């Protein structure tokens, strides 16, 4: 796999964003599956606006993309980002989030949001 050289400012912004445990966990979850905000609420002890703010910051840097389906928005990692290869390298050293994903799937947030 060919390594991409990324502008130092963008690398600094990426590392700063991933320095927050919630954002790092969100990105790690999104590596394994797409999610809507209400699904992410199942694994974080925080408010919906807080999760949305974290996702906005990740989206602003181009790490996360969104797809609207009806009134719901699903988030996933942006594999076409110039930071994606670096992000993958970082996430290779982060524990996978299988337990949190099981928690999401077990909780059935569709009863709450309809997504």
Give a label for each model feature.
Residues 1-4, 36-38, 51, 92:
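Short acidic/polar alpha-helix capping motifs at helix-coil junctions
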Residues 2-5, 10, 80-115:
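Amphipathic alpha-helical dimerization/coiled-coil segments
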Residues 9-49, 73-82:
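N-terminal helix-turn-helix DNA-binding core of bacterial DNA-binding proteins
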Residues 41-42, 53, 59-60:
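Alpha-helical residues within the helix-turn-helix
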Residues 46-49, 61, 73, 95, ...:
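Juxtamembrane/interface motifs at transmembrane-helix termini
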Residues 59-69, 76-77:
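Beta-hairpin "wing" of winged helix-turn-helix
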């Amino acid at each position: 796999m060919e390594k991409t050289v990324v502008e130092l400012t963008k690398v600094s912004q990426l590392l700063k964003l991933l320095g927050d445990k919630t954002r790092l966990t969100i990105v790690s979850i999104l590596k394994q599956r797409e999610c809507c905000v209400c699904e992410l609420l199942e694994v974080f002890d925080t408010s919906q606006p807080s999760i949305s703010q974290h996702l906005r910051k990740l989206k602003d840097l181009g790490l996360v993309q969104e797809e609207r389906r009806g009134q719901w928005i699903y988030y996933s990692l942006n594999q076409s980002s110039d930071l994606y290869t670096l992000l993958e390298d970082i996430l290779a050293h982060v524990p996978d989030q299988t337990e949190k994903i099981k928690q999401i799937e077990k909780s059935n947030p569709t009863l709450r949001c309809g997504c």
